[in-house]
Amino acid sequence: MPDENKFPLIGEKFPEMTVETTHGSMKLPDQYKGRWFMLFSHPGDFTPVCTTEFYSFARRFEDFQKINTDLIGLSVDSTISHIEWVNWIRDNLKIEVPFPIIGDSMGRVATRLGMIQAESSTSTVRAVFIVDPNSTVRLIMYYPLEIGRNVDELLRAIKALQMSDKYRGAMPANWPYNELIGEKMLNPAPKNVKDATGRLKEFKGYAWWLTYKDVPDNEVQETKKIVKMREEK
């Protein structure tokens, strides 16, 4: 039996649970089987930073869809509060929030996922869980109350995970704009002396343990189009 008091870690299966959302009842992670999904919590409805975040997530929703990723929000507010808030966003900020938001007024889901603030039993931190099509947790992030999330970085991280899986490598800092190897990806470190000896003969690199290879250009261009920071007009 899974330990209900243990928070999920990177590399573990996302815990099974039934949640109530603004789009109805859902079973997680089965609802998103075969797709990536990003579950993110916010401290509360009708708050300044959270409202700017939801505006950004709604505005960039199609970019997440382009990389096979669904969004689902959460806070320890009721679904009624969520509905009123997204209606306010629609009416006043002129944008629809197209993704579901979990109503968790008892804090059951937030507690299970380790999202509750240390100094408060009634508010969630800005947590992010990125889950792959096999329902495995691939990335966990926590942001403090006073800082909103960077949507471009979340998109970049998801796309980088997808590229790592697809082409069996690792993605460098700031990919696809890395200062050393640009758009390329890193090879896994050799596992034995034989592999280490031949690594620089097979790939370009700075050392046998630091070599790189090309990523298909169409993948790079898709990533740049989606995650490039854009100045608002």
Curated annotation (Swiss-Prot):
Where in the cell is the protein located?
Cytoplasm
Residue ranges constituting the Thioredoxin domain according to the UniProt record: 8-163
Binding positions for substrate per the UniProt entry: 126
Asked whether the keyword Cytoplasm is assigned, the reply is yes
Q: Which UniProt keywords apply?
A: Antioxidant, Cytoplasm, Oxidoreductase, Peroxidase, Redox-active center
Into which EC class is this enzyme placed? oxidoreductase
Q: Report the Pfam families cross-referenced here.
A: 1-cysPrx_C, AhpC-TSA
Q: One GO term of the cellular component aspect?
A: cytosol
Q: Kindly identify the residues recorded as the active site.
A: 50 (cysteine sulfenic acid (-soh) intermediate)
Question: GO MF terms on file?
Answer: thioredoxin peroxidase activity
Known catalytic reactions: a hydroperoxide + [thioredoxin]-dithiol = an alcohol + [thioredoxin]-disulfide + H2O
**Entry's EC annotation:** 1.11.1.24
GO biological process terms held by the UniProt record? cell redox homeostasis; cellular response to stress; hydrogen peroxide catabolic process; response to oxidative stress
SUPFAM superfamilies, per database record: Thioredoxin-like
The record's listing under InterPro entries reads: AhpC/TSA, Peroxiredoxin, Peroxiredoxin_AhpC-typ, Peroxiredoxin_C, Peroxiredoxin_TDXH, PRX_1cys, Thioredoxin-like_sf, Thioredoxin_domain
The record's comment on protein family reads:
Belongs to the peroxiredoxin family. Prx6 subfamily.
Q: What does this protein do?
A: Thiol-specific peroxidase that catalyzes the reduction of hydrogen peroxide and organic hydroperoxides to water and alcohols, respectively. Plays a role in cell protection against oxidative stress by detoxifying peroxides.
Q: What else is known?
A: The active site is a conserved redox-active cysteine residue, the peroxidatic cysteine (C(P)), which makes the nucleophilic attack on the peroxide substrate. The peroxide oxidizes the C(P)-SH to cysteine sulfenic acid (C(P)-SOH), which then reacts with another cysteine residue, the resolving cysteine (C(R)), to form a disulfide bridge. The disulfide is subsequently reduced by an appropriate electron donor to complete the catalytic cycle. In this 1-Cys peroxiredoxin, no C(R) is present and C(P) instead forms a disulfide with a cysteine from another protein or with a small thiol molecule.
Summarize the subunit comment: Homodecamer. Pentamer of dimers that assemble into a ring structure.
Q: What is this protein called?
A: Peroxiredoxin 1
Please report the organism this UniProt entry assigns to the protein: Thermoplasma acidophilum (strain ATCC 25905 / DSM 1728 / JCM 9062 / NBRC 15155 / AMRC-C165)
